[in-house]
Amino acid sequence: MTVNALLLSSSRVGDTPYLSHAIPFIKPLTTNAQKWIFIPYAGVSMSYDTYLASVVAGLSELRLDISGIHQHPDPRQAIKDADGILIGGGNTFHLLHELYKYDLVHLIREEVMNGKPYIGWSAGSNVSGLSIRTTNDMPIIEPPSFTALNIVPFQLNPHYSNYRAPGHNGETRAQRLLEFTRVDPITPVVGIVEGSALWRQGETLSLLGDNPAYLFCGEQQEIPIPVGSDLSHLLK
């Protein structure tokens, strides 16, 4: 079995309906996977039931059987029984805290590396990398470790944008990622713009969508990655 993981930057593009832009990206992963488990742990400002309902509605045209992990008495068994794993956005620190709390980090990695499809967006993409050290989120809770799922062996920065509002004096996203590369100059960071996604199929990694991504690594800063690029070298 080979890895089949889709890492979406966001759940929306502009004013589009929830997850609608991602349907063409998601559909190929559902060909042989009907029963999906949704992990809503990043959703801090809403109930898990509300979050689940929005995902079910957003993906309704795919006619999938989606349940929330919070509905199952044994979260680990729920992961094992599912055909595929969905992890939504929200607060990455809270998400990873709960994954460690229920002893799911190593299990999810094992299942995905053995071929179980994985779809994450925003925080769900953040945790697919080596660690969550390049998330945009506020550290509202402290997980036991920043080490994440390592489905891809580099860092991700979803919702990437280097826009600076006029008159704003805070750091840009590029400046924040530069700080990371000063501390860890050998680990690549891929910034994925809203509407874009990374798709890992075995030892192949490609960029989907209509916008470039951006690479940060050591002295290389904000290097554009053209749409459709083969990024398989980042898996080495």
Swiss-Prot record:
Enzyme Commission designation: 3.4.13.21
Descriptive protein name: Peptidase E
Pfam families xref list: Peptidase_S51
Any GO CC annotation of this UniProt entry: cytoplasm
Cellular compartment(s): Cytoplasm
Family, as annotated: Belongs to the peptidase S51 family.
InterPro entries: Class_I_gatase-like, Peptidase_S51, Peptidase_S51_dipeptidase-E
Catalytic residues in the record: S122 (charge relay system), D137 (charge relay system), H159 (charge relay system)
Coiled-coil annotated residue ranges, if any: none
Major localisation: cytoplasm
Keywords: Cytoplasm, Dipeptidase, Hydrolase, Protease, Serine protease
Keyword Hydrolase: yes
HAMAP family referenced in this protein's UniProt entry, alphabetically: Peptidase_E (MF_00510)
Reactions that this protein is recorded to catalyse: Dipeptidase E catalyzes the hydrolysis of dipeptides Asp-|-Xaa. It does not act on peptides with N-terminal Glu, Asn or Gln, nor does it cleave isoaspartyl peptides
Family annotation (SUPFAM superfamilies): Class I glutamine amidotransferase-like
Function: Hydrolyzes dipeptides containing N-terminal aspartate residues. May play a role in allowing the cell to use peptide aspartate to spare carbon otherwise required for the synthesis of the aspartate family of amino acids.
Molecular functions per Gene Ontology: dipeptidase activity; serine-type peptidase activity
Superkingdom field: Bacteria
UniProt GO BP: proteolysis
Record has rRNA-binding as a keyword: no
